[in-house]
Amino acid sequence: MPELPEVETSRRGIEPYLVGHSIQYAVVRNARLRWPVSEQILTLSDQPVLSVQRRAKYLLIELERGWIIVHLGMSGSLRMLREENEDEAGKHDHVDLVINNGMILRYTDPRRFGAWLWCEDLATSSVLAHLGPEPLSEAFNGDYLYEKSRNKRTLIKPWLMDNKLVVGVGNIYASESLFSAGILPDRPAGSLTKAEAALLAKTIKAVLQRSIEQGGTTLRDFLQSDGKPGYFAQELQVYGRAGEPCRTCGTPIESAKHGQRSTFFCRRCQR
């Protein structure tokens, strides 16, 4: 599943081709995604793009009369291609935005768990309501994590993945951040000390920022907007490495199920 770095990589990749230009029209080949593609998107015509933003794992395309909200789901990706390639769409290419600069923004999603929604005012969007702070913002810090963790019996790993606590820390980056901070994922969140909370917040920021710089993590379906894979997978310390030696101490990496999601950790390096 594309996580925050992959979505931010997509945002940065498509922004130069959209902002300052207009969407001439949309081509929707399959409207049956996680939710049906909004009717307002189907009827877009000559709409200037004012900005391309991100909130959590949602891409927000600002137009003069509203917003397109895009979620990549489990396997979605966005890429830019030239308009002459419009007829080369495959069976998993569900949505195109045709831009007035000769480019097309194409949405590909083999599993069709993504979403293309319309909203006139982001403040009224149900999918954006009740989200926690952005992990790369100043609002997310050690003091915040420590206060939120008090008396929490939830295991640290699934706790970090709760979008009401902090957005965008998905399965990959929760495992990687906990390893970098030396914290076992199966401890209760309430066991965090102030020092550990400060280190964990700092580590989450560093891991996410590094992944963004590397273009995200390509595990199955994710590609950058230029069609190239992300390279952070080459730097993964624990995720997906069960049974392999820890890159730090050589102890075999272990895996466990937390909240029905696979968690990876080093029993020696993490406490």
UniProtKB/Swiss-Prot annotation:
A zinc finger (FPG-type) spans 237-271. Its cofactor is Zn(2+). Keywords: DNA damage, DNA repair, DNA-binding, Glycosidase, Hydrolase, Lyase, Metal-binding, Multifunctional enzyme, Zinc, Zinc-finger. It catalyses: Hydrolysis of DNA containing ring-opened 7-methylguanine residues, releasing 2,6-diamino-4-hydroxy-5-(N-methyl)formamidopyrimidine; 2'-deoxyribonucleotide-(2'-deoxyribose 5'-phosphate)-2'-deoxyribonucleotide-DNA = a 3'-end 2'-deoxyribonucleotide-(2,3-dehydro-2,3-deoxyribose 5'-phosphate)-DNA + a 5'-end 5'-phospho-2'-deoxyribonucleoside-DNA + H(+). Binds 1 zinc ion per subunit. The keyword Mitochondrion does not apply. The active site is at P2 (schiff-base intermediate with dna), E3 (proton donor), K57 (proton donor), R261 (proton donor). It comes from the Bacteria. HAMAP family: Fapy_DNA_glycosyl. One of its GO terms (biological process) is base-excision repair. This is Formamidopyrimidine-DNA glycosylase. Monomer. Involved in base excision repair of DNA damaged by oxidation or by mutagenic agents. Acts as a DNA glycosylase that recognizes and removes damaged bases. Has a preference for oxidized purines, such as 7,8-dihydro-8-oxoguanine (8-oxoG). Has AP (apurinic/apyrimidinic) lyase activity and introduces nicks in the DNA strand. Cleaves the DNA backbone by beta-delta elimination to generate a single-strand break at the site of the removed base with both 3'- and 5'-phosphates. InterPro entries: DNA_glyclase/AP_lyase_DNA-bd, DNA_glyclase_Znf_dom_DNA_BS, Formamido-pyr_DNA_Glyclase, FPG_cat, MutM-like_N-ter, Ribosomal_uS13-like_H2TH, Znf_DNA_glyclase/AP_lyase, Znf_FPG/IleRS. SUPFAM superfamilies: Glucocorticoid receptor-like (DNA-binding domain), N-terminal domain of MutM-like DNA repair proteins, S13-like H2TH domain. One of its GO terms (molecular function) is class I DNA-(apurinic or apyrimidinic site) endonuclease activity. Gene3D superfamilies: 1.10.8.50, MutM-like, N-terminal (3.20.190.10).
